[in-house]
């Protein structure tokens, strides 16, 4: 399950955590800690004849209480140990390197070599191939391949370039080729890598609101049980005198009873559940800026999902050639192939492949044709080829219409009908024109990812609404939304429209999650309850989000929601189990503890425990051992299933509520029998 090194380190840390300064952070376990100290003191007082407490029995109680505290420490130390193991690999990427600081951006020969730790925000550095990027920054000049495997674990290099949404670089990553001029955006100790290490190690982990609320509940229950236990000594003294039978409860038994009734199981595991949840997110290559963000992910009920890369494969594929009247399909395919032969985009290559498959149209001798290729630009929104007094263009319908009209041609109405048909089916139409004559339309189809419809169905079962965000026109968006099975869509989306949509849902009381990578996504990311910024995105997007996906995968949002829900479920399930345990331990201890004074209570000794001594020993042994038994579950998390919240609650109440009632009865009885057979009691 875990490496031996982590186990060994956790055992050492368990003893170090016995420090009062650390124990006071967990009020419930502090109660056990104080109880262990008191029981130990009573043992020594009894040993030297100062007290009437049974020395052997008191020693056994004291030792079991100390082990209970150690087991709780061990659970937390194991979770922290996993985090430290992750952090150690990250620290290897964080090392001080010499940086070429430019005095003048325009003169790359005029540099000062400074240590990366001495760089300040705004400094300009020059990085060459095979060098490590010294600090987080924004590329202001150049384009290069960057190896980010030290952070993301992905071995394939990624492109980083100035301008656009791929300009952010991370300190500790390595340039594979070319060069970059980078403006530093962080100082030592505040870099992305530093934040990752701090988060993974748990150094900057703060208790979440739900965690604090649960701890307040546990402390309140502990105080109530403390008050009840404190009254037992005078009460039993009075009752035994009045009944003329039995004797007052001993201080050792009061301590043992208090520890058994207090919610120690969840108190011991609460911290490890939170740390393990953060660790699971880190293992998914997601950095959360706070535990609050993970909890919010568990409560999310609206997901805003980008169409491209999340719902569709991202690369549209040519599926049909649709000619206008008077033009054959092969004629259209021939012109489309010529206009796309130099197009290196996935869409362009798919047009060439389709022409070859349908009509066996292959490459030409472009040198002999004296061909000149026309690349696509955002201004013209067209690409094409000029050869031997022929001109072919392909592009968006409105761009081609403007081109044809400007050159004195006529744009056929029939083409409008074909364009509308393609858009209505969820495709992207590209119009082809040769020598100012419209030939027809290339049908580019968005390929919806396999299994995505089923995933959205699962999300719907969980009560989560999915909304597709796309820049496509409403007809295209509606067709893709229907095919993918999302609940709603936002077409022709702008940054302002996304921001307003998030606010609208939040006003209705929903929690909203979204992903983004560009500077234009920053306002919406800042507004969303769970905002996942892509690691390939801009600095502005990363700063606006409360999570960063190191893999830059838009589909990761669904996994983040699952991890958040699993964290909340694990905490809820173990709390239910712990409270149910207390009820069972109550029936184990109270009857045998008091039937000397009140013989009628013998009827409540449902387990038939041998004696008060064996009952208390069995109960506190179980109380300690159950912590160790539940550590794997607290670290791994309760298995999450896609079903409505009501069914999920009923299922967990049955497993962890009823299970929490039955397990102690069986375990305590078995321990009691073992103690009796061994002659310990």
From Swiss-Prot:
Asked if Isomerase is a keyword of the record, the answer is no
Which residue windows are coiled coil?
none
**Reaction catalyzed:** K(+)(out) + ATP + H2O = K(+)(in) + ADP + phosphate + H(+)
Enzyme's top EC category: translocase
Read off the PROSITE patterns from this record.
ATPASE_E1_E2
Q: What residues does ATP bind to? A: 343, 347, 376-383, 394
Query: Which terms does the record give in the GO molecular function aspect?
Result: ATP binding; ATP hydrolysis activity; magnesium ion binding; P-type potassium transmembrane transporter activity
Location of this chain's protein in the cell: Cell membrane
Question: Source organism's superkingdom?
Answer: Bacteria
Query: What keywords are assigned to this protein?
Result: ATP-binding, Cell membrane, Ion transport, Magnesium, Membrane, Metal-binding, Nucleotide-binding, Phosphoprotein, Potassium, Potassium transport, Translocase, Transmembrane, Transmembrane helix, Transport
Q: Is Signal there in the keyword field?
A: no
> How is this protein annotated for GO cellular component?
plasma membrane; potassium ion-transporting ATPase complex; potassium:proton antiporter complex
Q: Where does Mg(2+) bind?
A: 517, 521
For this protein, what is the EC number? 7.2.2.6
Which residue spans traverse the membrane? Answer: 30-50, 59-79, 216-236, 255-275, 587-607, 615-635, 661-681
Which family, according to UniProt?
A: Belongs to the cation transport ATPase (P-type) (TC 3.A.3) family. Type IA subfamily.
What does the function comment of this entry state? Part of the high-affinity ATP-driven potassium transport (or Kdp) system, which catalyzes the hydrolysis of ATP coupled with the electrogenic transport of potassium into the cytoplasm. This subunit is responsible for energy coupling to the transport system and for the release of the potassium ions to the cytoplasm.
How does the annotation summarize its subunit structure? The system is composed of three essential subunits: KdpA, KdpB and KdpC.
Can you name this protein?
A: Potassium-transporting ATPase ATP-binding subunit
Organism for this UniProt entry: Listeria monocytogenes serovar 1/2a (strain ATCC BAA-679 / EGD-e)
| Classification of source organism | Bacteria, Bacillati, Bacillota, Bacilli, Bacillales
């Amino acid at each position: 399950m875990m490496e031996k090194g982590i186990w060994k380190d956790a055992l050492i840390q368990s003893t170090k955590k016995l420090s009062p300064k650390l124990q006071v952070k967990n009020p419930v376990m502090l109660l056990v800690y104080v109880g262990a100290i008191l029981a130990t003191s009573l043992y020594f007082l009894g040993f030297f004849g100062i007290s009437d407490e049974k020395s052997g029995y008191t020693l056994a109680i004291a030792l079991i209480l100390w082990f209970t505290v150690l087991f709780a420490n061990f659970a937390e130390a194991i979770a922290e140990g996993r985090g430290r193991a992750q952090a150690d690999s990250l620290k290897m990427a964080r090392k001080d390197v010499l940086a070429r600081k430019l005095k003048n951006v325009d003169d790359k020969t005029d540099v000062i070599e400074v240590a990366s730790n001495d760089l300040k925000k705004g400094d300009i550095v020059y990085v060459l191939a095979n060098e490590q990027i010294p600090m987080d920054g924004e590329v202001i000049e150049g384009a290069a391949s960057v190896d980010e495997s030290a952070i993301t674990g992905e071995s394939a290099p990624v492109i980083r370039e100035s301008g656009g949404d791929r300009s952010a670089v991370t300190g500790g990553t390595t340039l594979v080729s070319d060069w970059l001029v980078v403006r530093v955006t962080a100082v030592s100790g505040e870099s992305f890598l530093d934040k990752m290490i701090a988060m993974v190690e748990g150094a900057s982990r703060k208790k979440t609101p739900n965690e604090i609320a649960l701890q307040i509940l546990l402390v309140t229950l502990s105080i109530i049980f403390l008050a009840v236990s404190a009254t037992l000594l005078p009460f039993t003294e009075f009752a035994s005198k009045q009944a003329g039978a039995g004797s007052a409860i001993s201080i050792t038994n009061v301590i043992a009873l208090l520890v058994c009734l207090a919610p120690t199981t969840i108190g011991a595991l609460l911290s490890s559940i939170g740390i393990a949840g953060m660790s699971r997110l880190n293992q998914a290559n997601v950095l959360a800026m706070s535990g609050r963000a993970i909890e919010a992910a568990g409560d999310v009920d609206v997901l805003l999902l980008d169409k491209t890369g999340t719902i569709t494969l991202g690369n549209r594929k040519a599926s049909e050639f649709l000619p206008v009247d008077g033009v054959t399909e092969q004629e259209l395919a021939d012109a489309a192939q010529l206009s796309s032969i130099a197009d290196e985009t996935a869409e362009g290559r798919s047009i060439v492949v389709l022409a070859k498959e349908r009509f066996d149209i292959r490459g030409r001798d472009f040198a002999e044709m004296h061909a000149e290729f026309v690349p696509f630009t955002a201004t013209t929104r067209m690409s094409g080829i000029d050869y031997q007094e022929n001109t072919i263009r392909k592009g968006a319908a409105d761009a081609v219409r403007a081109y044809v009209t400007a050159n004195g041609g006529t744009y056929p109405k029939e083409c409008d009908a074909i364009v509308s048909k393609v858009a209505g089916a969820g495709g992207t139409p590209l119009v082809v024109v040769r020598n100012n004559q419209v030939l027809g339309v290339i049908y580019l189809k968005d390929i919806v990812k396999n299994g995505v419809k089923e995933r959205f169905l699962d999300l719907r079962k969980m009560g989560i609404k999915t909304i597709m965000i796309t820049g496509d026109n409403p007809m295209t968006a509606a067709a893709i939304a229907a095919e993918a099975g999302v609940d709603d869509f936002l077409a022709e989306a702008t940054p302002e429209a996304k921001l307003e949509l998030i606010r609208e849902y939040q006003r209705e009381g929903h929690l909203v999650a979204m992903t983004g990578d560009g500077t234009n996504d920053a306002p919406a990311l800042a507004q969303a309850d769970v905002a996942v910024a892509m690691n390939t995105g801009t600095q502005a997007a990363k700063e606006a989000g409360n999570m960063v996906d190191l893999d830059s995968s838009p589909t990761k949002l669904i996994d983040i929601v699952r991890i958040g829900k699993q964290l909340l479920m694990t905490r809820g399930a173990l709390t239910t189990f712990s409270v149910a345990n207390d009820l069972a331990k109550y029936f184990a201890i109270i009857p045998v503890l008091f039937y000397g004074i009140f013989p009628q209570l013998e009827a409540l000794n449902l387990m038939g425990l041998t004696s008060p001594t064996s009952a208390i020993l069995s109960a506190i042994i179980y109380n300690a051992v159950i912590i160790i038994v539940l550590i794997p579950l607290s670290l791994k998390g309760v298995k999450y299933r896609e079903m409505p919240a009501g069914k999920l609650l009923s299922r967990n109440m049955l497993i962890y509520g009823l299970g929490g009632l039955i397990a102690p009865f069986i375990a305590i009885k078995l321990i009691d029998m073992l103690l009796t057979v061994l002659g310990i009691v």
